[in-house]
């Protein structure tokens, strides 16, 4: 969850060195004052039934996060570099990517902060759900059952994955009720 705010100065005032490097200036921004000047809007909520092909998560340690999701969710590594990993089920390029591009000192996510509160992963059977629970318990990952077919799993970075049995409508097609 990052945004860069800047205002370009005229090129004539840039600090351009003989070797072509441009030396930038970073100054503290009075973010709260600027926020107070703006129009307040309701938080953005995805439309009901929105389905994602894949998501990217900011984590403190991409290797640790990748191994966690591989062990607990049964995903496979598709491609990794020292600061990121792309993992998936089956032959898909990636369902989940984790990266540490926000910094190695990234604090665990806390409930109530801006950004992704949780994402939903649907599984096809109770056995699959219980296997995820077993794998999570082996890693001592926090689990909170919401009902008999839905739980929240918290990863080492404080990111919540809501896992539930797939729901079907009268046309027998998969859909997500969450917004």
Task: Give a label for each model feature.
Residues 1-79, 90-147, 154-179:
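Glyoxalase I/VOC metalloenzyme domain signal
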Residues 84-87:
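Beta-rich nucleic-acid/ligand-interaction surfaces
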